[in-house]
Amino acid sequence: MPAAALDSSSQAAAPAVKPPPAAFRTIALGMTVDQVKDALRKDALYRYRGDPDVSFLPLSGENLIECEGSSYLSRGYFQFAEGKLYVLILVLDPQKLDHYSMFTAFTARYGEPSTFNPKEAVWQSETVRFSLERPLTVKYIDRRVFEAQVARGAAQQDLEQLSRERFIDQF
């Protein structure tokens, strides 16, 4: 059998690999705080209580929604920057789901992870970092917003270091 025939048959048998997701059910990275609140109210998987589940993070000036889950979901965390969802964290119920089953399903759907170690498996695209972590947690992160936040934090640290050095120089 010619090698070209083998190549085409093995390619046909391989399932199509999708990019890592930017959404879970009706909640997607980039949604506004109000859109996420509305989606949480409408989805029975979340036990969203309204504003008592919303916090303001004073150091970063960001909002965080934290709510209990039901069924397979223990808790959900939704972090915003400039009014847009950029981190979605789902803590899964280890009594109902296991790490191996989730990893196997994700690998079948999204291909081999770009990073894999005992603590996490990470799938990435240009815009999304999707990870399965231990304990049983799934994270969706908007990479562009996150990297901008990290760069801002590094710039702030540089300013603080410079201010510190100038203060010390006054003595």
Segments (PLM) and residue ranges:
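Hydrophobic h-region of N-terminal signal peptides that target proteins for export
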Residues: M1-A5
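Non-cytosolic coordination micro-motifs
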Residues: L6-D53, I89-F171
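Mid-chain, structured segments of secreted extracytoplasmic proteins
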Residues: V54-L97
